[in-house]
UniProtKB/Swiss-Prot annotation:
NCBIfam families: leuA_bact (TIGR00973), PRK00915.1-3 (NF002086), PRK00915.1-4 (NF002087). This is 2-isopropylmalate synthase. It catalyses: 3-methyl-2-oxobutanoate + acetyl-CoA + H2O = (2S)-2-isopropylmalate + CoA + H(+). Pathway: Amino-acid biosynthesis; L-leucine biosynthesis; L-leucine from 3-methyl-2-oxobutanoate: step 1/4. The lineage of its organism: Bacteria, Pseudomonadati, Pseudomonadota, Alphaproteobacteria, Hyphomicrobiales. Belongs to the alpha-IPM synthase/homocitrate synthase family. LeuA type 1 subfamily. The keyword Disulfide bond does not apply. Keywords: Amino-acid biosynthesis, Branched-chain amino acid biosynthesis, Cytoplasm, Leucine biosynthesis, Manganese, Metal-binding, Transferase. Mn(2+) binds at residues 21, 209, 211, 245. Gene3D superfamilies: 1.10.238.260, 3.30.160.270, Aldolase class I (3.20.20.70). Its EC number is 2.3.3.13. It is an enzyme of class 2 (transferase). SMART domains: LeuA_dimer. It comes from Bradyrhizobium sp. (strain ORS 278).
Amino acid sequence: MSNPVQSDKDRVVIFDTTLRDGEQCPGATMTFEEKLNIAAMLDDMGVDIIEAGFPIASDGDFEAVNEIAKRSKNAVICGLSRAGAKDIDRCAEAIRPAKRGRIHTFLSTSPVHMKYKLQMDPQQVFELVISSVTRARNHTDDVEWSSEDGTRTEFDFLCRCVEAAIKAGASTINIPDTVGYAVPEEYYDLFKRVRETVPNSDKAVFSVHCHNDLGMAVANSMAGVRAGARQIECTINGIGERAGNAALEEVVMAMRVRNDKLPFWNKIDTTQLTHASKVVSAATSFPVQYNKAIVGRNAFAHESGIHQDGMLKNAQTYEIMLPETVGVKQTSLVMGKHSGRHAFIHKLEEMGHKLSSNQVEDAFVRFKALADRKKQIYDEDIEALIDEGMVSAHDRIKLLSLSVIAGTRGPQRATMKLDIDGVTRIEESEGNGPVDAVFNCIKSLVPHEAKLELYQVHAVTEGTDAQAEVSVRLSQDGRSMTARAADPDTLVASAKAYLGALNKLVMKRQRDVAPGHGASAAAAS
C-alpha cells in the first residue's frame, strides 16, 4: 500500500499484462468469463493499468477488451497494437468505453528484428514510430510506445526513436527486455543513459517490461526503477511468453519488504496476492510451483527442525514478511459434511471469493456432495471446487457418469455417459489401462483429432481420501488448451480435466470461425 511519507515521484505504477502477455504463454488461453473475472480482481486489488488484450488478434480478444473497458472502475484499460493504422484503430474502438483508456503501440527496433522480422531499414522504422504514435494520439491522450527488443537495439537509434515518440505524443515509453537477455547492471545503465541523452525524456514516464529467460526479470525490473523508470509491466505468477515475465507479487513485495534499498511505493493491496495467484492458476491451469516466491505453497512452510524451533521462538528468525501481508492465513478452518450454508458462505468470503447467489448455491451443492465422500474439507479442496465450477459453467460437453472396470488381467473397460449440447450419449471403450480406457471413451463420444500433450496428477491435500487434481493439455490446429479438475476419484478427475480442455478447444474454435458458422461440440475435429 502507499506510504504517506513518500512522494509521488517515488510512486511506481503497476501495469499488469496477465490478460495479454500472460495469455500468450502456450496453453494458458482463458475463456471470456475468466478474463472478466481476473480484470475485476486486478481492479479491486489496486492495479493501475490493466492490459486487457490484443484487440486485432481475434474477435474474442476484441470483445474481452471492450467488455473489460465497460466494466472498469478505477484502472486504466489498455489494449496492445502494432504500428499499423488498422491495428491502432481497432484498439481504439475496443478501449473506447473505458473511463480511462490507453493505446499501447509497439515496433521492433533491434537490427535483427528490423532485418528479418520487419524487413525494413532504420529510416522506415523511425518514420513508422512517428506515424503510429501520432495516429494513436488522435484517439486518446494516453499513448504508450514500446521499442520491441529494446535491450538489443543500437543505443543511438533507440534514443532517436524514443525522442520522436515523445515528440509525437507518447506519454509512456517502454524499453522492454523482450528476450530476457539483459542483466541488472546493464538494464540500469540503459535506462540511466537514455533518460540523460534524450532531451525530452522528462515529458514521459519510462516503463520496464522484463522477460525471465535468464531468471532475472524481477531483478532487471527493479534495476530499471532504480534508474528512473516509474512503471513496471508484470503478470500474476510471472506467466508469459517462454520463461515468463516479472511476477507482480514479487516486484510489489520487493518494494515493500526492502523499502530501505528500494524506496518506492505502489497502490497494490498485498493481502489479495495469494488469492490472485490461485485465481490465475485456475484460469490458466498452470500450477504454481511449491517453492514460488511470495505465493508458493512452501513460501511460509518450515520443515527443518532447526527452522521450526526458531519459528516457535520468534517468527522473524526465518520469515522476512508476515504471511498475512500477502493473504496467507496462519490456520485453516476445517469443514465437513455437518457444515451449513452460512459457514460455507463465510468461508468463501474469508477466502476472497465473490460469487453470485446462483454460483454460491451451485458450489454449496457440490461441497456437500464432496463432504459425503471425504472426511475433512480443507481450504485447498474448496479452491479446487470453486475453480472447477467457474470453468465448467459454460461447458457444452458435460460428464454425467463414469464407470471403470480395471484389474490385473485383460484390457480395462470404461463406460461413460455425457451430455453433449443437451443430448445424452453413452459409450463403452477399452484401453491399455483405466485412464486410456476413459480417454478412448471420450474420443468415441466426441470424435476429434486433438493430441494429448500433458497428463499430470497430484493430491490436493494429504490423506488417503485426498482429492486428486489432474491437469490435461490438448492441442489441435495450432491451438493448445489446458484444464484442471479435482475429485476424490482420480479417473473421474481425469475425465473432467480432459473434457475441460476439449470444451476450451471447442469454444476457441467457435470464436475463431466467422459469425454464423458455429462449431459443433459433437464433432470437435
